């Protein structure tokens, strides 16, 4: 079905990109937190801490923090990360590291793998037991504390009750409402407190109560937080959270992720960008991500299959444009250009513009920022009808959506 969608998108000029769509989806940047503050704090909020495992220039915490600092006079947004990273223009702090507890966490994770040898290693699962500590005094300086991606031992949820400030938790995957998995795929055990045989852990009978214990521990910790508002980037994720019993009685607000349309916009001369990449004139360019190509959630294994099917059906004038670093060598039936790992967002916007379509075969995604970025550059996305992706890709208008 994805190959059919690719063939159907040959004439991308038939796709319509309504201005109202981009206003609603992409122009939220600075206004994002204003909406949140109307639920959890007074309009006088001046200081906010964004807490996350790590960030990059393309991640939601970075974009939000940057937009708030640029667009809201007098408001200061600071990033608090487990892994410190230097990013120009933003104030970044690292959560305090303690050598003894760090070693204990590593041993705990190793013991977890020993107890569960059948656990799927290709899907992330976070215990968040003995997570990184917080400087509570530092947190008291903020008017609002905004949590983002806090898996991977970033925090111990039991510590959150000590933060006496309004907490906003934006869910970027399913982790918050499960025992520890980030992508539920076809599993619905999170609707029943993760009781049963977890398909990701593959636990022997003796340890099959581990997911239920982790779920219960997390729910108790969230229940002790004095002030907590949840934000989901898609209606799909909001409905999934509501199906879980992790957050009874908590306010859940749906707000789409921001995209800077001053940055991600159609290039003035896409032919010059193509020439610089060595792409022959007149080629039909299919762009896709190469990083994590064989991650089962990203669905990258469909890309060679789609290309082989297109070749079998007689399409020859195709050129593949790959973003990111490819972990494994793959033989494609068409010429390809690898742009490598991209850190310059202006360059990324140019690559989106150079493509005729963006192939995004994700099997579960909250919203798909890459789809929003490519569409902001007026490059349609071809994707599956899964998760919150259909909320971003309007089938037949800003892209094509294939049944999964």
Locate predicted features.
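Membrane-proximal helix-turn-helix segments that form the acceptor-binding/catalytic region
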Residues: 162, 175, 190-231, 239, ...
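Carbohydrate-associated surface elements
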Residues: 236, 258
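Conserved donor-binding/catalytic core segment of Leloir-type glycosyltransferases
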Residues: 279-298, 304-307
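Nucleotide-activated donor-binding/catalytic signature segment of Leloir-type glycosyltransferases, i.e.
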Residues: 317, 324-349
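Short alpha-helical donor nucleotide-sugar binding micro-motif in glycosyltransferases
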Residues: 350-355
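A short hydrophobic beta-strand element within the catalytic core of glycosyltransferases
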Residues: 358-359, 382
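Short hydrophobic beta-strand element within catalytic cores of glycosyltransferases
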Residues: 380-383, 393, 401
């Amino acid at each position: 079905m994805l190959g059919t969608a690719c063939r159907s998108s040959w004439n991308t000029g038939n796709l319509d990109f309504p201005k109202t769509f981009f206003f609603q989806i992409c122009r939220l940047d600075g206004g994002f937190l204003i909406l949140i503050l109307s639920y959890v704090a007074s309009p006088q909020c001046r200081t906010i801490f964004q807490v996350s495992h790590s960030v990059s220039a393309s991640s939601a915490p970075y974009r939000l923090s940057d937009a708030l600092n640029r667009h809201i006079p007098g408001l200061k947004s600071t990033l608090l990360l487990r892994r410190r990273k230097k990013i120009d223009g933003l104030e970044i702090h690292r959560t305090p590291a303690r050598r003894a507890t760090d070693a204990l966490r590593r041993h705990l994770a190793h013991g977890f793998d020993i107890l569960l040898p059948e656990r799927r290693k290709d899907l992330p699962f976070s215990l968040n037991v003995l997570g990184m500590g917080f400087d509570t005094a530092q947190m008291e300086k903020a008017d609002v504390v905004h949590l983002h991606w806090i898996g991977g031992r970033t925090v111990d949820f039991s510590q959150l009750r000590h933060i006496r400030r309004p907490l906003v938790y934006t869910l970027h995957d399913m982790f918050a409402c499960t025992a520890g998995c980030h992508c539920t795929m076809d599993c619905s055990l999170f609707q029943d407190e993760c009781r049963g045989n977890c398909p990701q852990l593959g636990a022997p009978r003796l340890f099959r109560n581990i997911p239920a214990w982790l779920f219960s521990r997390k729910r108790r910790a969230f229940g002790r937080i004095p002030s907590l508002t949840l934000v989901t980037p898609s209606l799909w994720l909001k409905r999934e959270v509501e199906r879980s019993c992790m957050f009874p009685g908590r306010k859940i607000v749906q707000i789409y992720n921001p995209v800077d349309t001053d940055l991600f916009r159609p290039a003035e001369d896409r032919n010059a960008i193509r020439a610089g990449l060595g792409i022959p004139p007149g080629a039909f360019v299919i762009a896709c991500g190469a990083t994590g190509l064989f991650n089962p959630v990203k669905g990258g294994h469909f890309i060679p299959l789609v290309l082989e099917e297109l070749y079998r059906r007689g399409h020859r004038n195709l050129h593949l444009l790959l973003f990111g670093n490819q972990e494994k060598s793959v033989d494609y039936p068409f010429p390809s250009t690898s742009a490598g790992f991209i850190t310059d967002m202006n360059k990324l916007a140019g690559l989106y513009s150079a493509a005729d379509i963006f192939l995004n075969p994700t099997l579960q995604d909250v919203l798909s920022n890459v789809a929003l970025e490519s569409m902001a550059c007026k490059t349609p996305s071809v994707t599956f009808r899964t998760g919150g992706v259909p909320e971003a890709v309007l089938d037949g208008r800003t892209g094509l959506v294939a049944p999964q």
